[in-house]
UniProtKB/Swiss-Prot annotation:
Superkingdom of origin organism: Bacteria
Pfam families, per the entry: RRF
Subcellular location: Cytoplasm
Species this chain originates from: Acinetobacter baumannii (strain ATCC 17978 / DSM 105126 / CIP 53.77 / LMG 1025 / NCDC KC755 / 5377)
Gene: frr
Keywords carried by this UniProt record: Cytoplasm, Protein biosynthesis
GO cellular component: cytosol
Name listed for the protein in its UniProt record: Ribosome-recycling factor
Primary location: cytoplasm
GO MF annotations, alphabetized: ribosomal large subunit binding
Gene Ontology process terms (BP): cytoplasmic translational termination
Length: 184
């Protein structure tokens, strides 16, 4: 029973780390990467769909993305969606769309660091919330006399160790992302 709770908490914390990586992927580092445009939604036959469902997104060079729509009629809509996204990008339109990434200034890098720190803090909060939920479940087992106080204390210590491990992993990934952001 306690082992199931531990496994469940670890799986949920692992999903939180995966979510953190997705959040970090949205933070621009100055190098072109197709995931930068993952959050862009394009109007397509009356509904908004992710850009990667209506176009191929690739890297032309280190500072330029190339977007090749599946349908030529989508070029204007994709161009508009990229311009209106909060990424601060200005695409160049022809048959395909070239998206040059402006060089990051020191100020922009600092802003990106703040965003990365915010993502990391959100991940830590999520991990701590998972810990709180699991500790609550363990206390409920103790109240129902399904486990002893010693088992409850031991399980609480184990959950804390798991939590510390994942919080340290978040810190490690944040440090790596910050180093990547500050690299010119």
């Amino acid at each position: 029973m306690i082992n199931d709770l531990k496994k469940d908490s670890e799986q949920r914390m692992l999903k939180t780390l995966e979510s953190l990586e997705q959040g970090f992927a949205k933070v621009r580092t100055g190098r072109a990467h197709p995931s930068i445009l993952n959050g862009v939604m394009v109007p397509y036959y009356g509904s908004d769909v992710p850009l990667n469902q209506v176009a191929n997104v690739g890297v032309e060079d280190s500072r330029t993305l190339i977007v090749q729509p599946f349908e030529r009629t989508m070029v204007a809509a994709i161009d508009k969606a990229i311009r209106e996204s909060d990424l601060g990008l200005n695409p160049i339109t022809a048959d395909s769309i070239r998206v040059p990434l402006p060089a990051l200034t020191e100020e922009t890098r600092r802003d990106m660091q703040k965003i990365a720190r915010s993502e990391a803090e959100n991940a830590k909060v999520a991990i701590r919330n998972i810990r709180r939920d699991v500790l609550g479940d363990i206390k409920a087992l103790l109240k129902e006399k399904e486990i002893s106080e010693d088992d409850e204390r031991r399980a609480g210590d184990d959950i804390q160790k798991i939590t510390d491990k994942y919080v340290a992993e978040v810190d490690k990934r944040l440090a790596a992302k910050e180093a990547e952001l500050m690299k010119v």
